[in-house]
Amino acid sequence: TGDNGIEADNREGDELVTPVSMPSIANMTIVVRDDQRAVRLRRGTGLMLFNSELLNGDTCLRIQGESLNLLGSGITFDGVQLDCATNVEGDDVDAIQSFLDSSNVAEGANPPPAGTLPADGFFEANSTIGADVDSWKGNWTFGI
């Protein structure tokens, strides 16, 4: 229904089937409307998120079902800022909050230090949290 910045699912009915959906994303900024979620993970999907911002929405992060079992292994956050009306919701809010508390994550208006990107050669090292909007938006974007 278009109410999530990212909604990621593995296979419904067989959530642990491989390959598991597990994107790696760095330097992303998601700004959603007040009635939306920034990220929703469910049905066994993972997410490696680095140097990113989840901002403005009703909820920053919702994790459900088999995805909860991936906290800290198939779900990792490093250098992530959560600043929404409610930062965390899901099937086990305490487990999600414990994961965030032990990660390089800041909740609120001040971003955390930049995280360490995977040394796989795909990402370029930088010290920016979120998208570097001013350097790339040019004349083709709006609302930023």
What is each PLM-predicted segment?
Residues T1-I144:
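Extracellular beta-rich repeat passengers
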